[in-house]
A protein has these predicted regions:
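A domain-start/cap signature at the N-terminus of enzymes
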Residues: 3-13, 17-47
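Alpha-helical transmembrane segments of multi-pass membrane proteins
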Residues: 19-26, 316-321, 358-368, 454
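Juxtamembrane/start-of-transmembrane alpha-helix segments at the extracytoplasmic/lumenal side
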Residues: 294-308
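Hydrophobic H-region at the start of alpha-helical membrane spans
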Residues: 8-16, 307-311, 351-353, 394-397, ...
Length: 608
């Protein structure tokens, strides 16, 4: 595929300009337009675990005028920016906020020198780490001279809520409010609850639903004996969501709020944050009082989605620019004859449908293989383990499909391996030089992508996180243990996806309309069924209050599959345009493997 001279360079330049603009806007929202200082940091627990944090410090907070503090714990698998909604809104109101990963998640992980494996060869994170990590963060936050340690708030989403309630119980003289978002765990009842408490949980919270009888059963959560005991209700009394029990002004306030949202959406839902701000307003006087309805955090969500799209555009255009340079021009081989099914014929549509199914049918099953609680080879990779299984099964399925196509169609037409994109030259021979240059190309492209992200990350002090998709810097302790492993396990899907698509997609040069159609087809093959699975999962939870795939935590796959969709769209876009330009899968394979490994290592990085 020839690129009109300068088009790729212009696209790359525009993506960089827009990236700078969006980064500035993200900094503006995150810092309340300069009124709040934001910093990143790490603590080390007694077990040698890195505790990654992000801190928001209003410029009004000082030694002479200390501000109340908020310790926020994000949910399992998330990075610190999953707490941005609460951090932005609390810091706008003058609070010092510290958001941390649950140890074993995000960028909080055991140092490589202390990671060990059990008798089943599973990576072990000390069980005391999550509790110790949140306690360590709380002690650090309250030790800061500009924090009023007598006016503290703790809370978090999912696992973060479970561990911060333990912190609150350990510091009942200091903590004025504990809020659990999507977590019906209330610590140790014997320690008491001498602080205000709010449970904010979606009516369609799939995690809570699956822990009950799994259908329209959120009332089981509200009428839980431990929760009613905390609220001062008897066994025969009903707890009414939306009703305030006790008095928040006297630190005896209790409330359950039930916005209509899902577990994975709760930290991004305006109504959830407004309920938190209402409880905060009723609990204490903050330095900069604002109505609970005055929120701006959603703008960061929109901007981050834009940055994820720009990352895709930047990497794709950079690849095209590099391929037009003298160094890498020889990677562009002559177009090969198309031996695939006739476009728009009945058999072509059938083949596209088969490819769509093959790319998505195994994802929930794969999730259940690592979610049953029974250790196996892939559980060592945490939440990324099921994606390895999915890649293996999908790659094998696409290999069988390709073999059947070749036996029934390709061989009769004189199709050769080079016509599947395996060529390394135009003479039909294997050229090691071509492979070496493709590897060099991949290293440079990945360095450009990583450099682009790191410039963004250290400038904005934010990762790229949208619900279940996340990109972080690659932690050194994961680089050898997981990054190279993810490249290996993602190889079957990345390789066979490029090969199998040649049975239905023309990658040679064509008119713009044909290119757009081919790109849409290519993307649909990779992600259409995955997206449908996620939408069916979400629809059942949101509208029918039912968690499908409850067995062996298959619902985790229902949630996480959208992260696979976003990551796959990025790598398939890069790969599609590289395939069009090079007419070979090798530059595409080498260039996209490190990208997909990066996404798998840092997205949903739960490691226990």
């Amino acid at each position: 595929m020839k690129t009109k001279k300068g088009i790729a360079s212009i696209v790359m330049a525009v993506s960089l300009v827009l990236s700078v603009l969006l980064s500035l806007l993200i900094v503006g929202v995150d810092t309340s337009w300069g009124a709040v200082d934001v910093k990143l940091g790490k603590l080390i627990s007694e077990n040698g675990t890195t505790i990654n944090y992000k801190m928001y410090i209003p410029k009004t907070a000082s030694v002479q005028n200390p501000a109340p503090g908020l310790l926020y714990g994000v949910g399992g698998g998330d990075g610190v920016d999953a707490g941005h909604a609460f951090a932005i809104e609390a810091s706008r109101r003058g609070m010092v906020v510290m958001s941390i990963d649950v140890p074993g998640n995000g960028l909080s992980e055991s140092l490589s020198s202390v990671v060990h494996f059990d008798e089943n060869n599973q990576a072990v994170v000390a069980q005391s780490d999550p509790t110790q990590g949140h306690e360590l963060a709380y002690n650090y936050l309250t030790s800061l001279p500009f924090v009023d340690s007598t006016r503290m708030v703790t809370g978090g989403h999912s696992m973060g809520g479970m561990y911060t309630v333990q912190v609150a119980q350990n510091h009942q003289d200091e903590v004025k409010l504990q809020f659990n978002v999507g977590m019906n765990n209330y610590g140790n009842p014997e320690l008491g609850y001498d602080f205000n408490f709010a449970l904010i949980i979606g009516t369609s919270d799939e995690s809570a639903l699956v822990r009950t009888t799994n259908h329209c059963t959120m009332d089981d959560i509200y009428q839980n004996a431990d929760l009613k005991n905390m609220f001062g209700l008897g066994e025969d009394e009903r707890l009414e969501p939306g009703t305030v029990y006790g008095d928040f002004a006297n630190e005896t306030g209790r409330a359950v709020y039930t916005p209509h949202t899902l577990h994975i959406w709760e930290p991004y839902t305006v109504e959830v944050v407004e309920y938190f701000l209402t409880c905060l307003e009723d609990t204490m006087e903050v330095p900069n009082a604002l109505p609970a309805s005055d929120t701006v955090f959603v703008w960061k969500d929109y901007l981050v989605v834009g940055m994820i799209a720009l990352l895709m555009v930047f990497v794709t255009s950079t690849a095209c620019v590099l391929l037009d340079t003298g160094v890498f021009r020889e990677l562009k081989l002559a177009p090969r004859k198309y031996f695939g099914f006739k476009p728009n014929s009945a058999v072509w549509w059938a083949a596209v449908a088969v490819l769509v199914v093959l790319c998505g049918y195994s994802v929930i099953w794969a999730s259940m293989q690592t979610g049953s609680g029974e250790p196996n080879f892939f559980t060592r990779y945490g939440n990324s383990g099921f994606k390895c299984i999915w890649s293996l099964v999908t790659g094998a399925s696409l290999l069988v499909y390709t073999a059947v196509f070749y036996a029934l169609v390709g061989r009769k037409s004189g199709m050769k391996l080079g016509d599947f994109g395996l060529a390394t030259g135009d003479d039909g021979r294997f050229h090691l030089r071509y492979i070496g240059k493709a590897l060099l190309f991949a290293v440079i492209l990945f360095a450009a992508a990583l450099g682009y992200f790191l410039l963004y990350y250290y400038f904005t002090k934010s990762n790229l996180q949208w619900i279940v998709f996340e990109i972080d810097p690659i932690p050194m302790q994961r680089a050898g243990v997981k990054f190279l492993a993810m490249m290996f396990w993602m190889l079957p899907f990345v390789l066979m996806n490029s090969v199998a698509q040649r049975t239905v997609i023309r990658f040679e040069e064509g008119k713009p309309a044909a290119t757009v159609k081919a790109f849409i087809t290519s993307t649909a093959i990779c992600v259409l069924l995955l997206a449908i699975i996620h939408l069916v999962f979400v629809g059942n939870a949101y509208f029918a209050y039912r968690t499908i795939f409850p067995d062996a935590r298959g619902y985790i796959g229902g949630e996480q599959v959208m992260g696979i969709v976003v990551g796959t769209i990025i790598i398939n876009t890069v790969g599609f345009f590289m395939n069009k330009k090079t007419n070979s899968i090798w530059p595409t394979l080498f260039a996209t493997l490190p990208l997909v490994a990066w996404f798998q290592v840092t997205a949903s990085g739960m490691t226990f």
